[in-house]
Amino acid sequence: IDGGALGTSLSDDGRWLHDNVHLLTSELQGVCEAFKAKQKMPLVRTANEAIIPRVIVLAEAYLAKTEYQFSDKNFASYVEAFQQQTVLKTKELWMLISALKLVLLERIVERGAQAIANPKQSYGVGVCVSSLRDTSQASWKDILEPLILHDHILRKDPAGAYARMDLETRDLYRNKVVEIAEYSDFSEMEVASEALTLARESQQRRERDPRVALRCSHIGYYLLAEGATSLHQRVGYTPPLRERISSFLRRYPDEFYLNSILLITLAMMSVVVLLLMDPQVSPGLTLFAMLALFLPCSQAAVQITNYLVTSLLRPQILPKLDLSEGVPDDCMTLVAVPSLLLDEEQVRRLVDDVEVRFLGNHDRNLHFALLTDLPDSRSEPREGDPLVDLCEELIEELNQKYAGHGMGSFLMLHRHRVYNPREKVWMGWERKRGKLMDLNRLLRNEYDSFPGKIGNLSILPQIRFVITLDSDTDLPRGSAQRMIGAIAHPLNQAIIDPEKNIVVAGYGILQPRVGVSVQSSGRSRLASIYSGETGFDIYTHAISDVYQDLYGEGIFAGKGIYEVDTVRQVLDRRFPRNALLSHDLIEGAYARAGLASDIEVIEDYPSHYSAYNR
């Protein structure tokens, strides 16, 4: 629409159309895409015998009653009153957004045509355009969540966790209810009620382990975890083909993963040999050629198998509690950064980085500590060191700077070097692993290996979780609270087998996704080639990971959050001294590490090949 089409001047209705043409175009495209998606929506027959989705009739009735003036409050009240007679499915509630826009667009077209035909008359186009804009800007999650009726049932969770979970996890639970209802004879309300009944029944059983009791009494246990089988049997759930394949793969992960790699490797080797080798070549030479092909073919087979796994299995999202308003007292956490003190510039940078992490994740129950050693020495070290004194002074300055702000505190815990007869040097016992083991003992008043201590030591016995980071690891805003919320969730709390003394359910350690900083990716040719996508994704979402999606466990890479008591019980004194060159993998196997791929930390990428190979 332009002024020339309507004469030299536009009417008020024409002006509304002219000024909002981009809004109308974009909303029309969005509505078309929404209704193109093939969804089974309840249909109704209108007065003129047309059969259309029920949500469109509901949207038309609401807008007609309000004279096409949208308000989130009266809309919620209208739908709530409607559901007292007829319960809407969850997908219908979400389709109401597009239905409202569709009805408004139809009315804008109708009134716009009238305005063009008779520009001197007012037809109220502006009211419809304003309502269309309001529907686009409305906070629909806040509007629609209270209208999901089976959500009210889930909030009766006997474990008391559902109402404290974050929005993404509540959506995960609700979508699971919708999926089960779609492939069973039960409605969404009935599926949620059966899950609640199972959770309440579990409370009648006496479990020796209180964590097992909490896990089984949580409604999510019957939606996402081992209890889902019981719920499926009760409601007569018939899973779709994709779900059957996923369940089969997760039930037999080793058989699928290892056999797939083996079969693909043998197939590739055989094809190459048959195509390139002369039939008259001796069997010995053929065997040698196949052995030479084994390594490259096996690597290709691993990549192909990984692709198959990530194509067949959806990314596994770990449920989380919502701690955005504050970390509770029973989840007090210490962010610990093990590091060596090398020179004055490096010490100042260490303390500056601790302050940056604090400012992005400050909370009264979140504290920050440097765990420090001095470099290895061939000779017996002397008492005192100016670098230690400098670090203590800088940590004290931080505590004074932020005192009285109602936030966490800063600590420095420094160890003396001890003689290692095997390495023949004076060094911090067991290096990084030793720092964390010594920290765990200090937190539980078992043994004090830190003669140098600065900060509020009274909080140490109350620490439940430790977030361990490397000195070059950034902790993006809010990521600490999300990690704590994940590991504190009832389905993620570690359950230890008393006989094997290993974690068999839940997780003792959670590893976030590790991204690469933009600055480090440009420091060398090696970093720019291998670092891939860099920077922090502010819309961090779950991504596929072969081991987490297939086995339900991730690979611990030394950065993440762990529960102090669990790690102490499972790992303390488990391995002989000076025996582990890389301790992260084996510790993650015993303590059961999980990957929270929708939480991200950022670190520097190695700038030279020797560092890359460590």
Regions found by a protein language model. Give the residues of each.
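Internal catalytic domains of large membrane-associated glycosyltransferases
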Residues: 121-247, 316-614
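Short, charged/polar, low-complexity loop and linker segments
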Residues: 2-9, 81-85, 90, 149-157, ...
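Generic structural signal for well-ordered, non-transmembrane alpha-helical segments
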Residues: 18, 22-29, 101, 106, ...
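A structural signal for well-ordered alpha-helices, especially hydrophobic packing surfaces
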Residues: 2, 25-35, 86, 104-112, ...
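Active-site activation/catalytic loop segments of kinase-like enzymes and analogous catalytic loops
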Residues: 51-93, 100-114
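Active-site acidic catalytic loop and adjacent metal/ATP-binding pocket
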Residues: 5-73, 467, 473-478
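Alpha-helical bilayer-embedded segments of polytopic membrane proteins, i.e.
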Residues: 98-107, 244-306, 512-516, 556, ...
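Juxtamembrane helix-loop transition segments at the membrane interface in multi-pass membrane proteins
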Residues: 305-319
